[in-house]
Regions:
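Bacterial Sec-dependent N-terminal signal peptides
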Residues: 1-26
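Extracellular/oxidizing-compartment recognition motifs
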Residues: 23-419, 428, 444-445, 449, ...
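Non-catalytic C-terminal accessory modules of carbohydrate-active enzymes
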Residues: 172-199, 256, 315, 584, ...
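C-terminal capping/lid segments that line or modulate ligand- or cofactor-binding pockets
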Residues: 180, 188-191, 421, 439, ...
Length: 794
């Protein structure tokens, strides 16, 4: 075997239901190339970088001639805002970015205006040092800019009024400590109703005592200005949606009886004076929503709302998520203290992720009436435009739960987990983006993620491991996944200008690794930063063996895999010398890694040349990088599937296990590899977890990969050429006998109906969009496909 070592001389490169998800209106081009007439404004005499919640108001007159057909405004804030017109909430934002790309929303407020006097109001908050890690910030600020001269009357300046809220204080500051987990989504909200300026967003409110806003500076768009505090860019994703979501069931109460009609909003619940009660609500599936609680009376009462993915037993185990006996809630929470008046609505500043919500209520001398409680479900407006079914109905539940997981992990960026972090990691985002492409056909969040990571690059050339983020974290392996993500986009979308802009950054990323190649062994030497691979089986940080000491086969082979993808990109964009260099380097890395790490005795690829540890991960990358032949890859795959003594992949890396199965022409085994998802369903999970039990997060979209693989692996629908210009259909049915699938591609929809014909044959009914061709392949036989409907029997 060791004669496979190839010595290569490499050449050097020379070269509410508020429908907030409509299409975004156009921006006046002048505002994208010069300073805005409006000002960034703030509240005077306040610490601008500390925690604070602010109310901004502006009254303005419309002429009696009638309402305008359009009234476009551009809005942004630091940290965030919620915008009201004449008392109605119409928008929130901005989409998260960084100071170099601070996003603004463009909103047509004409439908909400009336002749005569109108009120434009905004709730703006800055979490200061308590902000989520995903929140970048400069200081508290707010801006509104009219799109044209007709809308300039609402521009932010000293004519706006502002009041700092005394009602808000942060709470739930010890979430991470109580949950014994990394949790960085920001604090909960404690709101004192007697200090809240109720109806402040309406025209009738008297703001005579409010301060005039303080002008900071004129906003500047990307590419312009000097001394910029924020550099503004148009929002590049749709506005997030909101829709009402009611609780279906009360699971437990303490010291009170609750009629089921309370949950429908038809029957208020009265909590007597001087009582302590608790009510456990079960959404019956994970959700991301703004809980809204409407109360009357109960002056001085204390209402604590605790949110959790699951309940915990005394050993802090979750167990079956449907079971609540001998378990208690533990998690993020908010507190509301009513002022005693009627129909007071509490809503937290930011959404909460939960399955269970517990109300712990303490009343004083005044009875408290709970008029209603529900959630306003929110998230990116992903729409299901694909379908999958088979003769195994259990796969439908996996498909359904995977889609739900993907939805909850999509907001103004991809979230790793909506409960614990709400951070966009490259390793997660690659899988999430493919799910989005295959199930919805929507590529906008994928494009934003690629750009976000592009903007995160460090002077060394690596992308940050998660971004946007106010804390530096670099995961070199995730920088490689960023390159893979661009390659994915290139294969699935025809957008040369978008892809081409990243080539210099791709080169810099890959050169960071090239500069760290051990010149003796021709494998990667010692690597800095956090070289995360997978959570289990390595160490507490999921770091690959050999990453810090040098000669990690896993990362070396992933680097080779990425070099081959980059070579395809550079060759496609007329950089043949660079492509040749990348291919030769990949070949050299593969050959030397195989030489040093292949163990003839057990037929496995070791994690390092010392051959002390072995993992599925090393074998996976050996197959994907081309370090082994097809026959060798099949032998290797059988060993890593059957040898339970070696490091096993978790849910994240099962995506790559499946990719390796397909490359080894063993995709039919995928169906048997679905047991981990079946096990999660048996545990009562309504979304897919971060890793096998015990898991921190119950909702992690890197574990939703079956929603991609049911279409790309079982149905076998893949791009045949870049841009999905042609289609390759290569089914891997496994033990299934019938499969139906439909998915969107740029040209339209691809549909397949597949039925086994005897033991080895297949009958395929395939529908391709107009002007689309492809190839159908089954057990080594190929049939050319044309546009329209065709029936194939093999």
């Amino acid at each position: 075997m060791k004669f496979r070592l190839i010595l290569i001389i490499c050449t050097i490169f020379c070269g509410v239901n508020q429908v907030l998800c409509q299409a975004l209106p156009p921006v006046n081009p002048q505002l994208l190339k010069s300073a805005w007439p409006a000002f960034w404004i703030t509240s005077p005499a306040n610490q601008q970088r500390e925690y604070g919640v602010y109310h901004f108001r502006k009254t303005f007159l419309l002429p009696a001639a009638g309402k305008p057909k359009s009234f476009l405004i551009h809005v942004s804030a630091d940290n965030r805002y919620r915008l009201f017109i004449n008392g109605k909430a119409i928008s929130s934002g901005p989409a998260r970015g960084d100071l170099f790309n601070w996003f603004f929303e463009t909103i047509d407020i004409a439908p909400y205006l009336t002749e005569g006097e109108n009120i434009l109001a905004a709730l703006v908050w800055n979490m200061g040092s308590l902000a989520p890690v995903a929140q970048v910030s400069n200081q508290t600020a707010f801006v509104v800019q009219g799109n044209s001269a007709a809308e300039q009357m609402v521009n932010t300046d000293v004519s706006w009024k502002v009041k700092k809220s005394k009602a808000y204080t942060p709470c739930a500051l010890d979430n991470g400590e109580r949950l014994k987990a990394y949790m960085v989504v920001g604090p909960g909200d404690q709101v004192d109703g007697k200090l809240y300026p109720w109806d402040w967003e309406t025209l009738e409110y008297n703001d005579a005592s409010w301060n005039a806003a303080e002008e900071l500076t004129h906003p500047q768009p990307v590419g312009y200005g000097t001394d910029n505090l924020w550099t503004l860019a148009p929002r590049n994703i749709p506005l997030l949606k909101e829709s009402i979501l009611r609780f279906p069931v009360i699971r437990r109460t303490n010291s009170i009886k609750v009629n089921k009609d309370f949950l429908t909003g038809k029957r208020p619940l009265t909590i007597p004076a001087n009582q302590r009660v608790s009510i456990l609500l079960d959404q019956q599936s994970m959700t991301a929503a703004y809980p809204e609680l409407i109360v009357s009376g109960g002056k001085g009462s204390r209402i604590k709302m605790t949110y959790s993915e699951a309940l915990f037993d005394k050993q802090d185990n979750k167990g079956n998520r449907n079971e609540i006996d001998a378990k208690e809630i533990k998690g993020n929470y908010d507190i509301f203290i009513p002022d005693g008046e009627g129909n007071r609505k509490f809503r937290p500043l930011w959404f909460r992720a939960y399955r269970y919500l517990q109300l712990d209520i303490m009343t004083t001398d005044d009875p408290l009436i709970l008029n209603d409680i529900y959630g306003m479900k929110t998230g990116y407006p992903l729409k299901m435009n694909a379908s999958f079914s088979s003769n195994d109905p259990s796969l439908q539940e996996i498909w359904k739960v995977g889609w739900h997981t993907a939805q909850l992990c999509a907001g103004d960026m991809y979230y790793d987990t909506p409960y614990y972090e709400q951070l966009q990691y490259t390793g997660d985002s690659r899988i999430q983006a493919l799910i989005s492409l295959y199930t919805s056909g929507d590529d906008r969040l994928m494009r934003k993620a690629i750009l976000d990571f592009y903007h995160s690059r460090t002077p060394e050339g690596l992308t940050q491991g998660r971004y946007p983020s106010n804390r530096l974290q670099i995961i070199p392996t995730f920088s490689l996944f960023w390159v893979s993500m661009i390659h994915d986009y290139w294969m699935h979308r025809h957008d040369d200008a978008f892809v081409k802009q990243f080539l210099p950054a791709i080169h810099e990323t890959l050169e960071w690794f090239h500069n760290r190649v051990d010149q003796k062994k021709k494998m990667l030497g010692p690597l800095t930063w956090w070289n995360f691979v997978d959570w289990d089986n390595f160490n507490d940080w999921g770091t690959a063996p050999g990453a810090e000491q040098g000669n990690s086969s896993i990362i070396t082979l992933q680097y080779a895999y990425t070099l081959n993808q980059a070579a395809e990109l550079f060759r496609a964009f007329n950089h043949p010398a660079q492509a040749d260099y990348q291919e030769l380097l990949a070949l050299e890395l593969n050959a030397h890694t195989y030489w040093y790490c292949y163990n003839e005795a057990n037929g496995l690829i070791a994690d390092t040349p010392e051959r002390q540890t072995y993992s599925q991960h090393a074998g996976i990358w050996a197959i994907l990088s081309g370090a082994v032949t097809l026959q060798e890859g099949q032998t290797l795959m059988k060993k890593i599937l059957n040898d339970k003594s070696i490091g096993q992949v978790t849910f994240f890396y099962r995506f790559y296990l499946t990719q390796a199965l397909k490359k080894a022409e063993m995709g039919d085994l995928y169906y048997k590899e679905l047991r981990p998802w079946r096990d999660m369903l048996k545990m009562g999970l309504t979304t897919f977890a971060e890793k096998p039990e015990p898991t921190r997060s119950d909702c992690h979209a890197w574990s939703a990969s079956p929603d991609y693989d049911f279409l790309a692996t079982i149905c076998g629908i893949m791009p045949g050429t870049p841009g999905f210009k042609t289609v390759l259909i290569k089914p891997s049915l496994g033990e299934l006998t019938e499969v139906t699938g439909t998915m969107p591609i740029p040209a339209g929809k691809v549909s397949v109906i597949l039925k086994r014909n005897g033991k080895e044959g297949i009958r395929a009914e395939i529908l391709l969009p107009e002007q689309t061709t492809g190839i159908f392949t089954w057990k080594g036989k190929e049939v050319k496909l044309h546009e329209g409907k065709q029936i194939i029997s093999i």
